[in-house]
């Protein structure tokens, strides 16, 4: 890395600092470093929301970053101070503290010489050129002209050069780290050597920030890179034991500030996030944002996000990994490997050798975490795989985990499936493709192939598996229908359906043991604990094609009657489900219209209030001017001596008109000319 060596040499030689643009220099030097003069007078209009250029409270105050002559910073841009009080904004060491203070908005780190405007913002700009997310004071660059090179610490450059030479355990294959991002590398290497469990990605996903740091706060200098939590606001509940969504808890987070998790009455059993750490490192998150933007993560191997594409599959399998491990019959059929490949089709064949190792790692999760598969995460995985979208999108919203619902009777199975899908997000369900599937199914049922399709539709009984419902299948492709992703080929040695006599399927039961074993034997994409392959028909050739059952055998009169009634019943259920979907969509549209109307009314009310306030200020100003004029006129017409009667007498020889007649008769001389010589 020649650039690092040159930069280190330049830093050691004391080369002049780089020239900054005027706007960048102003923010680096003055942003939140001085107290707002208007706030002390209660006149600052940028307090709520807080968008002022200056600080209002001490915990918003930012120290000015400086690079000394020896090439070091006055405070570290990476290692946080453990003695800084985030509530009061006071540090015992004062401004001389060599560590980073976690101010409001993390301004000391974002607006440091090393990080300010060194990365591109992922959000767009509005009509005024301001960031739509961070506003006017966005610390990231919007466009190539807004980028600035980072200012590097000389010790960091030396450590980076040592890492390149292999002195810190990097050796060959070390990525080209950008300047100013190598923080606590020696500590990370030391912890990895002391505790090799942190090298396991699954252990990091489940244990990051879940245990308190064993070191005293003053001895732990990792800060941002420490895999343990130091206070309750930094704590992350173990996702193996607690299931919670990525949505912040309304009792803990008010506005943009996170409060104490003890404010929530639900405690650790709450289904919402209690800290910024729980929200940022949620198991359903995707790729690490630092890796995506800069190609380097300061947390290193302790990061709970995915650093490479191939590890994203484990994140997607978080909510359904126990389905692969709870059934002993899944080891012989080879189905778990196929199911994993269906979960992440974009990873290709090279992942085949890694599935066994990941299976062993996930076995630890299954021993601690009982089989309670997440409904909505399974639906999200199936919908994502059916739409052909990869899992590397950093903006994909993680599906909130829900409780596993018990399997109901056969008459409500379709409603439960569609209800769970609607709980996830209504826009994920392709209504048009569902209607097309129903129309094509009606055409197949009423056409000439209808009686023939019932010849080989008798279900095949598989020992130790859940009985199959012989009646729900979409003739369209699995990638176009929202229910098509639930269809999976049935594994195991099964004979031809033509050799099996017709029989009426037994009713479905919701036994936990049977449900868990059956779900683990088929596919991790089942809804409410039901495997996706339970909706398949068994064709004569046992093909994984999602087309409806069309057997070439002769029509059977014995199986036509019961299956025809069953098909009619399921068709009625689908019509009812489609009607409910339309009702949901209409209700959602109505709510959206009402919300839009409320937003418009709120904006109009704010505009009217602003106009009324400006009119009020203008009216008060005019009133004061009129009152001043009236007072002046009244005083101009009164006698200056008695202040009661109007002046009417003209004094001589000065010709002043300031006294009334009685006062002019008694006054020996003009009050205005008193003490002044008369000009003749």
Curated annotation (Swiss-Prot):
Alphabetical list of SMART domains matching this protein: ZnF_C3H1
EC class of the enzyme, as a word: transferase
Stretches annotated zinc finger (RING-type): 639-674
Known outcome of mutating residue 639 to A: No effects on the interaction with RAC1 or SMARCD2
Record text about domains: Although this protein contains a RING domain, intrinsic E3 ligase activity has not been proven.
Function: May participate in a protein complex showing an E3 ligase activity regulated by RAC1. Ubiquitination is directed towards itself and possibly other substrates, such as SMARCD2/BAF60b. Intrinsic E3 ligase activity has not been proven.
Protein name: Putative E3 ubiquitin-protein ligase UNKL
Organism: Homo sapiens (Human)
Organism classification: Eukaryota, Metazoa, Chordata, Craniata, Vertebrata
